[in-house]
């Protein structure tokens, strides 16, 4: 790779690192091409970048970005997973991926400016994702309206039952 290509890679990585809300640094050892391709597809479908990075280029690209505090962890085989909107989904996908593979190890992560370790990433993976949270919030907002509708309807239903019972009583009497 010549100098121009390296500068281009650094520029591209710097741009992505600057936009990233979450960046997970992992060590992808002993994975075959089919497994990595499957992981890349799952991450790409979730709009998450997965890059095997050259450590020196990644460290240079990280300067002046939110990823800079974890640049010292770019040692040995390094995969960089970056998400630009949802911070939970990459952790969930990687935790799921790691269940069957001992060779894939998370070193560290930076989530919205806060550095967390591998255990923190595992804990983050157990949290509800953005879509789940939105669904829960929508349900919580809709719940009071549903209860109110039931409360408003209940007295009318009770009155209708009383009137119906009185009508039946009068019909039986004659």
Curated annotation (Swiss-Prot):
GO terms for cellular component: ribonucleoprotein complex; ribosome. It holds the Pfam family Ribosomal_L10. GO terms for biological process: translation. Keywords: Ribonucleoprotein, Ribosomal protein, RNA-binding, rRNA-binding. PANTHER family: 39S RIBOSOMAL PROTEIN L10, MITOCHONDRIAL. Belongs to the universal ribosomal protein uL10 family. This is Large ribosomal subunit protein uL10. It comes from Anaeromyxobacter sp. (strain K). The gene is rplJ.
């Amino acid at each position: 790779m010549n100098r121009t290509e390296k500068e281009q890679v650094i520029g591209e990585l710097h741009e992505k690192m600057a936009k990233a809300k979450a960046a997970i640094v992992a060590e992808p050892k002993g994975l075959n091409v089919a497994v990595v391709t499957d992981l890349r597809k799952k991450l790409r479908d979730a709009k998450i970048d997965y890059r095997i990075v050259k450590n020196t280029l990644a460290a240079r690209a990280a300067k002046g970005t939110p990823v800079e505090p974890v640049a010292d962890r770019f040692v040995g085989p390094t995969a960089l997973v970056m998400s630009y909107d949802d911070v939970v989904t990459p952790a969930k996908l990687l935790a799921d991926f790691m269940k069957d593979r001992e060779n894939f190890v998370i070193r560290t992560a930076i989530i919205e400016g806060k550095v967390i370790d591998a255990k923190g990433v595992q804990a983050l993976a157990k949290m509800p994702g953005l879509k789940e949270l939105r669904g829960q919030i929508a349900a919580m907002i809709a719940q009071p309206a549903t209860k109110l509708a039931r409360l408003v309807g209940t007295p009318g239903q009770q009155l209708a039952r009383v009137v119906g019972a009185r009508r039946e009583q009068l019909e039986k009497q004659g």
